């Protein structure tokens, strides 16, 4: 028999106006519809004041059910369709849900649960059509839209199906809302696997969190150094984090660095701390940097790919001290660290999104309009109140910095806007580029080294060669025995300081020349590509290190898989470094790298000489 079922039957008050559901309550479908309704809030469809018809029908895609195993269903199979206020569900799915009771380890676990999921999914579409939840700005920021918009049919940038419970969520905003709602209702682990999404949906849909899972706050620190990449697990548990800072690297020389780089710094407390307090600011070795970057595993960087979305945009978790060295030492850029004003709930929301982004997000990097600045603003805006997020209207890292430090915006606990450079240094809001220190060393050494004739260090860096410096150092060491001992020691220290930078600067330039020359030499190209292929083999994603069911791994998944990865990785890294050394020797063996090879050999001699010199003067107090 067919009858009308009032949603208000399930409501606390029958006086609330609500939709009516029209379905065959005596059928198997009707039975599952009623089960599904008990899982939803009583007022779930109160915004809909029309009749909603639920019926079953054969779909053309039913023929893709070539297996009665849930895990073997092909992509593209339609389970349900909503057109205005009419929901149609696949009769084949209903028949399988009625007949097959076995559980599976994929999807929703059984055909019956799959049927419930389809009902919840389609009812969510009806609700969304009325309330427009899928175009909510925070939802778009969480799921990874390029920019907040009014088009709910727009395809998501994030297409990381490896970490998704159902890749159908990436079709558009509407489907993302419906798919994630299915899992929020039916999967007790969802709120721990996709915590930011779960918190948002719970608040907007009125679906309470179950609290039946234990959130795993562990992530794996990434590194530009092969031997350190994915070797250290770290926790971003809010209880262990004192502050979250906006981390801004000043402008660099490269085209893509002209506007600086936007990041975050997590002030993580050392394990021995019992309370997250100001003392944690001293635990610098435990601090982390969150950096949205283009994921590039090509040895040859393509600017056109960077402009047109050819590289994925991902959230990297790096050790703060490595990031500090990257910018202040190697790129000679200032680094600003500004504490953000956040409530405990805002900090939790920020870190939940960090977890979810790290383990699931792979968007598209666009140099102009989806870069480190825009990704950083979206991440921060999701955690802030609407009024606060509107204060950060910029998309470039420098302008974001200026918005954040404005006193009137009240986004920091400190009055930073009017501070002088000296005051910024004193309060540790600024870590200066090493240029000033290096320049001091250079200007000091100009008094003793004839080849240091350029007044400006930048000109010296472009012209200097290791052979001339080696001759200067040898002459100085041989002829300075009568020099005042403390002054001689000072010269030695300055030499080592400058040479460490010059050696690293040289080693960074060699690959650039190899890339420029490789299209002129087939054999060279083969060696360069071998190096690139080796790097690709070792270039893995977080979700490949720990292969979770979906989303953020559980603690059990993490503790089982990560040690196995570490064990396998040791041998791979050793072999990779050996192979790369062979490739590098073959590359430098080319005739047009004779200058570089000679420079490298001379740098080795300088290192030996300066080490001996330091040892010689080391006893001087």
Predicted regions: what they are:
Residues 1-18:
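Classical Sec-dependent N-terminal signal peptides that target proteins to the secretory pathway
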Residues 19-99:
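Auxiliary, metal-adjacent structural segments of Zn-dependent hydrolase domains
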Residues 21-27, 101-114, 164-168, 250-253, ...:
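Second-shell loop/turn segments in exported
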Residues 62-64, 68-109, 240-332, 366, ...:
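Glycine-rich catalytic cores of cysteine/serine-nucleophile enzymes that process amide/ester linkages
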Residues 98-107, 133-169, 190-228, 353-621:
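Activation targets extended, charge/polar-rich intrinsically disordered C-terminal tails
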Residues 113-133, 178:
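Active-site recognition of the HExxH zinc-binding catalytic motif
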Residues 150-158, 233-243, 256-257, 261, ...:
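Active-site-adjacent bridging/hinge elements
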Residues 199-251, 259-261, 274-275:
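N-terminal regions that are enriched for targeting/export leaders
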């Amino acid at each position: 028999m067919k009858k009308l079922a009032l949603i208000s039957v399930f409501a606390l008050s029958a006086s609330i106006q609500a939709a009516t559901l029209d379905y065959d309550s005596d059928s198997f479908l009707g039975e599952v519809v009623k089960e599904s309704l008990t899982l939803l809030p009583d007022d779930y469809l109160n915004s809909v004041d029309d009749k909603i018809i639920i019926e079953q029908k054969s779909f053309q895609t039913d023929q893709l059910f070539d297996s009665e195993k849930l895990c073997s269903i092909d992509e593209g199979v339609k389970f349900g369709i909503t057109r205005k206020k009419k929901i149609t569900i696949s009769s084949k799915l209903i028949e399988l849900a009625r007949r097959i009771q076995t559980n599976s380890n994929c999807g929703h676990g059984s055909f019956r649960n799959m049927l419930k999921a389809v009902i919840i999914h389609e009812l969510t579409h009806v609700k969304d059509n009325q309330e427009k939840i899928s175009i909510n700005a925070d939802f778009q920021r969480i799921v990874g839209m390029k920019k907040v918009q009014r088009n709910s049919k727009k395809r998501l940038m994030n297409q990381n199906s490896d970490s998704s419970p159902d890749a159908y969520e990436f079709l558009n905003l509407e489907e993302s809302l419906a798919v994630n709602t299915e899992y929020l209702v039916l999967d007790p682990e969802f709120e721990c696997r996709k915590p930011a999404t779960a918190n948002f949906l719970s608040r907007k849909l009125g679906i309470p969190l179950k609290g039946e899972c234990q959130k795993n706050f562990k992530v794996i620190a990434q590194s530009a150094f092969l031997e350190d990449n994915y070797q250290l697990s770290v926790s971003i548990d809010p209880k262990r984090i004192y502050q979250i800072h906006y981390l801004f690297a000043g402008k660099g020389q490269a085209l893509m660095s002209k506007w600086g780089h936007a990041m975050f710094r997590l002030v993580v407390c050392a394990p021995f701390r019992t309370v997250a307090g100001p003392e944690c600011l001293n635990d610098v070795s435990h601090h982390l940097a969150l950096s949205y970057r283009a994921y590039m595993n090509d040895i040859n960087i393509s600017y056109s790919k960077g402009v047109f979305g050819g590289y994925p945009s991902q959230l990297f978790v790096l050790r703060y001290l490595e990031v500090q060295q990257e910018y202040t030492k190697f790129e000679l850029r200032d680094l600003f660290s500004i504490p953000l004003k956040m409530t405990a709930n805002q900090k939790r929301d920020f870190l939940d999104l960090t977890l979810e982004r790290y383990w699931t997000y792979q968007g598209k990097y666009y140099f102009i309009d989806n870069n480190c600045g825009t990704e950083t603003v979206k991440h921060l805006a999701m955690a802030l109140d609407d009024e606060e997020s509107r204060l950060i209207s910029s998309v470039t890292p420098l302008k974001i910095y200026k918005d954040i430090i404005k006193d009137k915006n009240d986004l920091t606990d400190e009055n930073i806007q009017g501070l002088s450079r000296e005051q910024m240094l004193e309060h540790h809001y600024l870590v200066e580029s090493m240029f000033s220190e290096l320049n001091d060393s250079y200007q000091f050494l100009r008094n003793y080294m004839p080849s240091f004739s350029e007044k400006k260090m930048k000109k010296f860096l472009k012209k200097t060669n290791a052979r001339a410096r080696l001759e200067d150092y040898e002459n100085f060491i041989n002829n300075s025995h009568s020099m005042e001992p403390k002054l001689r020691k000072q010269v030695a220290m300055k030499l080592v300081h400058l040479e460490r930078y010059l050696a690293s600067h040289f080693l960074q330039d060699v690959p650039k020349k190899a890339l420029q020359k490789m299209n002129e030499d087939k054999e060279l190209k083969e060696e360069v590509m071998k190096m690139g292929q080796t790097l690709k083999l070792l270039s893995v994603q977080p979700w490949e290190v720990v292969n979770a069911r979906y989303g953020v791994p559980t603690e059990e998944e993490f503790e089982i898989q990560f040690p196995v990865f570490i064990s396998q990785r040791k041998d791979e890294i050793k072999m990779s470094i050996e192979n790369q050394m062979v490739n590098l020797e073959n590359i430098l063996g080319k005739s047009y790298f004779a200058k570089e090879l000679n420079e490298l050999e001379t740098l080795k001699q300088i290192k030996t000489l300066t080490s001996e010199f330091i040892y010689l003067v080391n006893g001087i107090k």
